[in-house]
């Protein structure tokens, strides 16, 4: 490999094994038992330690940490492994930690996966192929994730859980049990609880208008009959209330999403 592909500020252990056309940007640290296969690219500030193997064409972004010891009290410096397959995209601040004696001694990631910013993959996890983990997904230890699974942002998965193939977990979901293949799982979504009356008062909105607007949204979202008709009725009833009319204007705009509503 040509040294021109390694930034001079990076620290590469002499015993590290680098394939063809490996590119290593500024301030990376590569340990002596690391193997980087052909066409791996480390953008900058990437740390790869331990007995770790990165498959060809994988791209790792700044401040990712791969192959560090597992976060468990029982860890006794056993020589465990981290194996990552080919064609993976590992974005900023992702952590993938090595296996442990209690989990087969290896954390394994397949091919063609996308791990977005801040993803954590704990010790002894087994990740399949073509999965997508959105921002800040957190996997505890010993988790198995099947091929083509998608996990939404800020979701956390309990240790030893299994996530089946082709399943999808919605964002902000705490997952404490197995998810069947093809399953769709999501936590309770945000619900409308009223108006931000304190904030409105601080910004100088008329208190009477604010309280009237609260009644108006209750009529819109909790009233009887057709939703569109309720919007028209409320617009006519409260046409002199600028707060209500601003809400009505928002409701009448095109949107690809539903509205947060009061909990039933």
Swiss-Prot record:
Molecular-function annotations in GO: acyl-[acyl-carrier-protein]-UDP-N-acetylglucosamine O-acyltransferase activity
Assigned keywords, A-Z: Acyltransferase, Cytoplasm, Lipid A biosynthesis, Lipid biosynthesis, Lipid metabolism, Repeat, Transferase
Keyword Cell inner membrane annotated: no
Subcellular location: Cytoplasm
Pathway assigned to this chain's UniProt record: Glycolipid biosynthesis; lipid IV(A) biosynthesis; lipid IV(A) from (3R)-3-hydroxytetradecanoyl-[acyl-carrier-protein] and UDP-N-acetyl-alpha-D-glucosamine: step 1/6
PANTHER family: ACYL-[ACYL-CARRIER-PROTEIN]--UDP-N-ACETYLGLUCOSAMINE O-ACYLTRANSFERASE, ACYL-[ACYL-CARRIER-PROTEIN]--UDP-N-ACETYLGLUCOSAMINE O-ACYLTRANSFERASE, MITOCHONDRIAL-RELATED
Function: Involved in the biosynthesis of lipid A, a phosphorylated glycolipid that anchors the lipopolysaccharide to the outer membrane of the cell.
NCBIfam families: lipid_A_lpxA, PRK05289.1
Family (UniProt): Belongs to the transferase hexapeptide repeat family. LpxA subfamily.
Protein name: Acyl-[acyl-carrier-protein]--UDP-N-acetylglucosamine O-acyltransferase
